[in-house]
Regions:
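Extended acidic low-complexity intrinsically disordered regions
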Residues: 1-16
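Short, surface-exposed, charged amphipathic helix/loop patches that serve as local interaction elements
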Residues: 2, 21-24, 28-133
Length: 133
């Protein structure tokens, strides 16, 4: 008799509430920054079958690449790969600090923890990579 292993099922999207700035014009026609406050922004959950999600995650795990890109670069890569709405994605990419705030938010951190938890090879890594006790 074979056993069927149930896989975890979850929605493919989640939301993060964040504020960000977009370019706009005032009544005199001068360019200003307009704040979009407390927007519920939809993001794709990180998925094993999405190559961009896997590349992004490997970038985060790679010390060299993480240092090279920095938090802003990784945050912007996350927005490019995971923001559901094209217009919102474009707006967010114009506000790097909003990208960082979203990238460091609890819902995003939780999704990365869940995603990394599906990587069997990470579970096999020693707790102390240096080998020292």
């Amino acid at each position: 008799m074979s056993q069927i292993q149930e896989t975890e099922r979850f929605d493919l999207q989640y939301t993060v509430t964040a504020s960000y700035f977009v370019p706009s014009f005032n009544k005199d026609g001068h360019m200003i920054e307009e704040e979009k406050k407390n927007q519920n922004i939809a993001f794709w959950r990180l998925q094993r079958r999405n190559i961009e999600h896997s590349k992004l995650s490997m970038s985060i795990l790679s010390r060299e690449e993480s240092e090279q890109k920095g938090v802003i670069g990784l945050a912007m890569d996350f927005i490019k790969a995971c923001c559901v709405n094209d217009k919102v994605r474009e707006d967010l990419l114009g506000d790097a600090l909003a990208c960082v705030e979203i990238f460091q938010s609890e819902p995003v951190s939780e999704d990365f923890r869940r995603f990394f938890g599906t990587w069997e090879f990470l579970k096999a890594l020693p707790k102390n990579p240096s080998g020292k006790k």
